[in-house]
Amino acid sequence: MKAIDPATEIYLVRHGETEWNRDGRLQGQHNSSLTARGRRQAEQLGRLLARLLGRQQRLINVSPLGRALETAAIIRQQVPGPEPIIDPRLQEMTLGSWEGLTRKEVNEQCNGVVGDDANAEWWFRAPGGESFDHFQQRVRSWLSEQRGPVIAVSHGITTRMIRGEYLGLSRHERLSLPVPHGVIWRLRGGGVETIHQ
């Protein structure tokens, strides 16, 4: 990967909670609307980003998926800047035919293939899903182009991959990173800081 400018600052956020998050359904690249809680999380992220960044105009990169776009629109109410740049490299990995199913349903169909989030290799076994290598390449491509302060609104597995790639973590380490809603990960100077409300 091309070296990242040490002065680059990335404020990485996961979209707010969705109906499918609440229901335990795998989303991948299918969409599900934010819940009332998810909209509140996005509002809180906007306020927190405004406190961290002041009222200076900030560039926002966002996944093209509806839940990320909705989160970015709510954040923009607090953080001024140009229209967000929609970048498909920030979208969630595709989970193929598993999208919309619960983990239990996938296990019933696929003889117990699903593990827990501490052993997330099962994500890359989805029929018609995205491979680890392809997923890693698109994240690397996005990350290598970042040159200034940017807010990135993305997804659970994608935020794991971005942070892991930035830190140079192993495959297992990056797939084990936590992905709560309502936090900001600040990537700068070769480190990642988790910022809570």
What is each residue range found by the language model?
Residues 74, 161, 165:
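Active-site signature of alpha/beta-hydrolase-fold catalytic machinery across serine-
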Residues 49, 74-79, 140-148, 186-187:
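Alpha-helix C-terminal capping segments
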Residues 166-195:
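Domain-level recognition of soluble alpha/beta enzyme cores
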Residues 32-33, 78-138, 176, 188, ...:
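Phosphate-handling substructures
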Residues 10, 58, 148-157:
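Generic beta-sheet signal
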Residues 18, 158-159:
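Short active-site segment of divalent metal-dependent hydrolases/proteases
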Residues 5-82, 109, 130:
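Active-site-proximal alpha-helix that buttresses catalytic centers in soluble enzyme cores
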